[in-house]
Amino acid sequence: TAEETMAEVEKLAEQGLVATFPMKKDIYLMHASYRDKVADDMVAYLEDFHKKNPYRLGSRKAELRVRFLSKLKQNVFDEFMQRLEDTGRIKRSGEFICEGGYEIPHDEVYKQFESALTAMLDKAGFEFIRLADIQLPGIQPAMAEDLLQLLAAEGKVVLLSDDLITLPKYTDMVAEKAREILAAEGKISIAMIRDMIGT
C-alpha cells in the first residue's frame, strides 16, 4: 500500500540512504550516494570553471541543470540546489552559481580594467561607450566581458543595453534632471532629455 511504501521510504531517509524531495503533489527520491556524487561532480566542475574564468560570477544555473540533472523536474532541481547551497558547498548570485568558498579576485588585472574603463566612461560623459569600443592591452574580449559584468554586478558601471555602458553618476544625473523637469513642466519627452544632456 501507499502507507507502507511511505513508511519504508521514511526509514530509508532516516538511515541516510535516500534523499526525499517533497513537492506539492509528489515526493521525489534520490539515492544518497547519487546525490553526493552529483554534488561532488558539480563542485569539482565549478572549481575548474573558476580556474578558467576567474572574473565570472559563476556558471549559469540552467547550464548546471543540463550538465548534471537534466532529467530532474525544475522544482526538484531548485530544491536540490537550495540544499546544496544550505551546506555551503555552492552559493548563488542571481542566476549564477559558484563554488561555496570562491571569491572573485580583485587583483591587478581587475584594478587596471576598472581604472581604465572608469577613465574612458568619464571622458565620454553622456556619449555612452559600446563594449566593442573597449580595447585595453592585455585584456581579451571574453575577459573584458566578464570584468564588465562583474563591475555591473558591483554597481560600478551601468549597462544601458546589451552593449552600451556608462557610470552610475551619469544615470543618476539624468534621473535627477528628469525629475526636476517633470515637476516643473508636468511632462517630459525624449527630446527634452536629449537637450538636457546635450546629445
Feature locations, PLM:
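C-terminal non-catalytic scaffold/interaction domains in large multidomain proteins
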Residues: T1-T199
